Amino acid sequence: MDKRIAYGIVIASFAFLQACTSPTKSEAPKAAAPAAAPSGSATDEIARYRAMIADGNPADLYEAAGEEIWKKPMGPKNVSLQKCDLGKGPGVVKGASAELPRYFKDTNKVQDLESRLVTCMVRLQGYDANEIITAGFEKGKRKDVEAVVAYVVANSKGMPIKVSIKHPKEKEMYELGKKSFFFQGGPMDFSCASCHAENGKRIRLQDLPNITEQKGAALGWGYWPAYRVSSGNFWTMQRRLNDCYRQQRFPEPVYISDNTIALSMYMAYTGNGGTVETPGLKR
């Protein structure tokens, strides 16, 4: 069977499952109170379905495109990204995302994978940072960033999450992320902790990991970026966080802003020791 057709069948099947189990758009998302899931529950069925199709993750297509973009000379300077230093030396992608976010001396900043790739695209290839930041997801050069993210994170799959807060700026970013995680506000008086600070919570049929604990943080951080079946595309962590802000009815965060990187630092460091399973496959 043609691989594209197989992917189409997988996507359609999962989309149908989602349509049958999701409320209408007019319903506001609510975190269900902790409850014991019965044997053979829909949650268990979804878990089995994910395991069944794990070898056919459509994120593989983004990964292949990202590898090509990484190696191809592009931009005003017509150079590739193969000299981009993601923290383990110029051009090294193996294991890089497992140790991000981290402090980079050349920018004097803590950066996540996406902000670091933007730095490389600006410095090495000559692109305009503002054009990437304001482009929107899946648009312009931001789309290239997303594809390269898929390529890079796939090269850490199976490795342990190993994020440091030894540098003062890393520690500062971690504390900012923790504060942001528990900050409560907006018209719904929500925070990240409203959904992700207790065990046993669910929204619709989706289990909500407790990000304040190592196991939950590893599940949350370790499986993103991921292919999102319900939307039919690949979501980076920046996009995942952007959608969390939307669900809380907060203003949309600026792409690769300090606050989004800080939240990533908090989640990643809390999940240290867990396994990187990216790119994941999500509802």
What spans do the regions from the language model cover?
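Bacterial N-terminal signal peptides that target proteins for export
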Residues: 1-8
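Repetitive helical segments and hydrophobic/amphipathic motifs
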Residues: 12-13
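C-terminal motif of bacterial Sec signal peptides marking the signal peptidase cleavage site
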Residues: 17-19
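Bacterial signal peptide processing site
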Residues: 21-23
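Electron-transfer interface patches adjacent to heme c in soluble/periplasmic c-type cytochromes
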Residues: 29-61, 71-147, 157-158, 183-283
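Short, charged low-complexity linear segments at domain edges
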Residues: 51-68, 158-178
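Hydrophobic, well-structured mid-protein blocks that either form specific transmembrane helices
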Residues: 148-152, 165
